[in-house]
């Protein structure tokens, strides 16, 4: 076959390169006539092979559509859509779609073979396998593709396993939530703390035990109920702060400071509802003067700056700690720390007394100015 085609390639190349010498060749028969004039003898079978040889590869991704005035170099037709092959020659679309060789008929430049690309074949067989109803398509390498029904069955199994896993994960969470709700309902049904304390005086103490008692914070009950007023909530917070300090061995934990800020916000909300601002001052004095030591001055100032008696702006009922003036209509006031035998205490000072104290340099230490 190669021996037959090799002289034909030379002849065809010469014919295509010298078309102008033989006039306008606009058909395949005209090309055969030109070959007969050049004493090129071919059989009918070789004629079919020669016609197929004049077709090129399907290389649409390597070419682009153009329109040239010259005829196709294979069929010699004009007024058709042409393609430019990688070597720079032009052929028509019809001749371009039926190739048998991977070379250019003009210059014999080799092209990469696209028909042997396994990607297109694999994609076609896989799509064909999915459209069937339970049949398999086997490739030459022995790889089998599953049908669409089996893929859907696998998806159903995966969905069922995910649902069962979620149910297993949610069971302990639901049980914990139900247990907490039962505990909250039981705590709401407990008697008032004052009555419980009075009954505890008449009840003999329990026998000693080696088991460490569980520390129950008062704030746990305060979060689950709303029957406590501002004063009672303040006392409970004081007890909780003292418990935290005793357990942690002092102040210095940022998480502890953050929790105190959250407690102060709760006291502010309770003070607004009950219109009892003295509870705020009582809690601040207890927190700053007794609980927080001197080495926590920066943290103490931070808390005072964030929460320094905002309730006075709305409905104040306090008086100045020096002159006794009612602080209800005062727009500006200050918080000062006064040293005493037990350490120090906080007082609220009106704007006039604050200015006098600043001039006289009294022992009052300014902590915060509220404008």
Swiss-Prot record:
<keyword id="KW-0862">Zinc</keyword>
<feature type="compositionally biased region" description="Acidic residues">
    <location>
        <begin position="178"/>
        <end position="192"/>
    </location>
</feature>
<keyword id="KW-0863">Zinc-finger</keyword>
<protein>
    <recommendedName>
        <fullName>Putative RING finger protein ORF117</fullName>
    </recommendedName>
</protein>
<dbReference type="InterPro" id="IPR017907">
    <property type="entry name" value="Znf_RING_CS"/>
</dbReference>
<keyword id="KW-0479">Metal-binding</keyword>
<feature type="region of interest" description="Disordered">
    <location>
        <begin position="178"/>
        <end position="218"/>
    </location>
</feature>
<dbReference type="InterPro" id="IPR001841">
    <property type="entry name" value="Znf_RING"/>
</dbReference>
<feature type="zinc finger region" description="RING-type">
    <location>
        <begin position="72"/>
        <end position="108"/>
    </location>
</feature>
<dbReference type="InterPro" id="IPR013083">
    <property type="entry name" value="Znf_RING/FYVE/PHD"/>
</dbReference>
<dbReference type="GO" id="GO:0008270">
    <property type="term" value="F:zinc ion binding"/>
</dbReference>
């Amino acid at each position: 076959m190669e021996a037959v085609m090799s002289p034909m390639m030379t002849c065809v190349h010469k014919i295509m390169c010298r078309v102008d010498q033989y006039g306008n060749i606009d058909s395949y028969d005209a090309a055969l006539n030109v070959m007969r004039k050049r004493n090129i003898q071919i059989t009918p079978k070789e004629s079919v092979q020669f016609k197929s040889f004049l077709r090129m590869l399907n290389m649409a991704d390597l070419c682009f559509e153009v329109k040239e005035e010259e005829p196709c170099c294979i069929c010699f037709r004009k007024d058709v859509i042409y393609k430019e092959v990688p070597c720079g020659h032009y052929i028509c679309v019809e001749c371009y779609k039926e190739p048998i060789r991977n070379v250019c008929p003009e210059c014999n430049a080799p092209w990469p073979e696209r028909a042997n690309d396994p990607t297109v074949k694999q994609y076609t067989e896989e799509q064909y396998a999915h459209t069937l109803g339970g049949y398999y398509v086997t490739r030459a390498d022995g790889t089998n593709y599953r049908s669409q029904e089996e893929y859907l069955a696998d998806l159903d199994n995966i969905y069922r396993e995910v649902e069962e896993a979620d149910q297993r994960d949610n069971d302990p969470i639901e049980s914990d939530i139900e247990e907490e709700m039962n505990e909250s309902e039981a705590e709401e049904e407990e008697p008032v703390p004052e009555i419980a304390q009075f009954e505890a005086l008449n009840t003999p103490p329990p026998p000693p035990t080696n088991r460490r008692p569980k520390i129950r914070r008062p704030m746990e009950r305060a979060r689950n109920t709303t029957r406590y007023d501002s004063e009672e909530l303040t006392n409970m917070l004081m007890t909780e702060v003292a418990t935290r300090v005793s357990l942690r061995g002092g102040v210095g934990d940022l998480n502890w400071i953050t929790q105190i800020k959250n407690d102060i916000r709760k006291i502010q909300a309770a003070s607004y509802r009950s219109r009892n601002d003295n509870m705020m001052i009582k809690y601040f004095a207890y927190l700053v003067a007794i609980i927080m030591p001197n080495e926590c001055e920066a943290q103490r100032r931070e808390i005072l700056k964030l929460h320094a008696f905002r309730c006075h702006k709305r409905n104040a009922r306090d008086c100045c700690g020096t002159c006794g003036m009612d602080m209800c209509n005062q727009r500006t006031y200050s918080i000062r720390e006064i040293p005493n035998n037990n350490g120090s205490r906080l007082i609220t000072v009106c704007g006039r007394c604050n200015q006098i104290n600043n001039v006289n340099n009294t022992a009052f230490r300014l902590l915060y100015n509220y404008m």
